[in-house]
């Protein structure tokens, strides 16, 4: 029996049916599955501006496949627009709001399945958390990647604009050049074009089996993206008939596959946070140490921005995520018996994919010639991060740095110092009280890291924070430091000028002071007053878990 029978069957449900008749149901439609289409459409960001077209195509295809689609809206936050402002504190919060809203709408109306459509970064994990919580048949449709901007012979992304700010501040480009980059960085619809957070998470979801093969790297404006959205609706109707549910797919092995692909494509640090959160909702025992274990055996084989040369549309032309997965599968680095929403195993899905990438491209490298021999997201531990932290070590020349701490209590204070040339080579920049509780909301530090790169300090300065980093960040950056400063973590005890060691080779992050002094500082520490007492940020700060556990808000 369909779950929607709770609102469509029996004489007692006559009032319920009366409401449904008003939105287009006829007598015969009450026997059809009701599919929710969770539409993240918004004109605030290029990431989501094209979603309405995909939603309409999905709606039409679901109806033709014998279902009754019911569309409802969910929110988005544009990280690119809110970046570097107080508004960025709402970004990670929006992941929870999206998950809560999809769960609420689907469960309140007893929907039989859900097709979630999203574009910007938090849309993907928000939808996946909801699918895992509800465990009703579901499919995710990614809005698609933006095409690269062009300026002379350069491919641009939005990160080019952030880095240009630092270049302008250090006198490397003039205002006219800055404006030219600004005007050409984002040429149309789609999510930020490198292997940043949105494209990383879409690749992870394709690997997990809850979106269709090849769909995670398609360009937003190409016809194949709309066709894939329609096909996704058809697959969802079949999944309802076959009772294929998210928890059938979201196994520990599936998460290990997703981590392997994130490493192989050089994906965002945010994947650690989001995969931990999705796994928690799915009841899967995934921990931060699993990322380090997998990193040690999976190389980076894709040469993608932010630290590489190519953008996601180039990856798609080179064979997309299936080509990446085929190499990993053949090398024994993926679990081939994991299934996708079509009911096919990974091994079945990849059987016709070439074992080696085409020699006519160099976006995807063969495993024998990786971009980096090991994964790029290292989990460091030490007295500064007893629960762990995430270091992105792709594109760095110096994996070990010991230097004096430059301590900032906010992103804004740090950015001002960088733009005023007060951060020097050899410094270890510390931005604290930006964690899940302390921020609250764990802002991304793209503005400071881009300014550092723009000032030609990317391989000379380290930056550590209890906040996050954008998927567009590269250099020696360490985020998600846990415990965070606001709950008494050691990062809150660092003084200006203290010696700090970051050793990505030894997986160490260390405050180099005597234990007696550490204990003295710890005893003197007082919990700071919350920055927000009310509203969504106040509520979030009271509920959110440590970043080492995914920064979730529905922990028991």
From Swiss-Prot:
Main enzyme class: lyase
Cofactor stoichiometry and binding remark: Binds 1 [2Fe-2S] cluster per subunit. This cluster acts as a Lewis acid cofactor.
Cofactor: [2Fe-2S] cluster; Mg(2+)
Positions of Mg(2+) binding: 79, 121-122, 444
Entry superkingdom: Bacteria
GO MF entry, a single one: dihydroxy-acid dehydratase activity
EC number: 4.2.1.9
One GO-annotated biological process of the protein: L-valine biosynthetic process
Catalytic residues identified in the record: 470 (proton acceptor)
UniProt KW keywords: 2Fe-2S, Amino-acid biosynthesis, Branched-chain amino acid biosynthesis, Iron, Iron-sulfur, Lyase, Magnesium, Metal-binding
PTM sites of type N6-carboxylysine: 122
Pathway(s) this gene product operates in, as recorded in its UniProt entry: Amino-acid biosynthesis; L-isoleucine biosynthesis; L-isoleucine from 2-oxobutanoate: step 3/4; Amino-acid biosynthesis; L-valine biosynthesis; L-valine from pyruvate: step 3/4
Residues given in the record as [2Fe-2S] cluster binding sites: 47, 120, 192
InterPro entries xrefs: DHAD_IlvD/Edd, Dihydro-acid_dehy_C, DihydroxyA_deHydtase, DiOHA_6PGluconate_deHydtase_CS, ILV_EDD_C, ILV_EDD_N, IlvD/EDD_N
Reactions listed under catalytic activity: (2R)-2,3-dihydroxy-3-methylbutanoate = 3-methyl-2-oxobutanoate + H2O; (2R,3R)-2,3-dihydroxy-3-methylpentanoate = (S)-3-methyl-2-oxopentanoate + H2O
Subunit structure: Homodimer.
Similarity-based family: Belongs to the IlvD/Edd family.
Cited function: Functions in the biosynthesis of branched-chain amino acids. Catalyzes the dehydration of (2R,3R)-2,3-dihydroxy-3-methylpentanoate (2,3-dihydroxy-3-methylvalerate) into 2-oxo-3-methylpentanoate (2-oxo-3-methylvalerate) and of (2R)-2,3-dihydroxy-3-methylbutanoate (2,3-dihydroxyisovalerate) into 2-oxo-3-methylbutanoate (2-oxoisovalerate), the penultimate precursor to L-isoleucine and L-valine, respectively.
Protein name: Dihydroxy-acid dehydratase
Organism: Prochlorococcus marinus (strain MIT 9303)
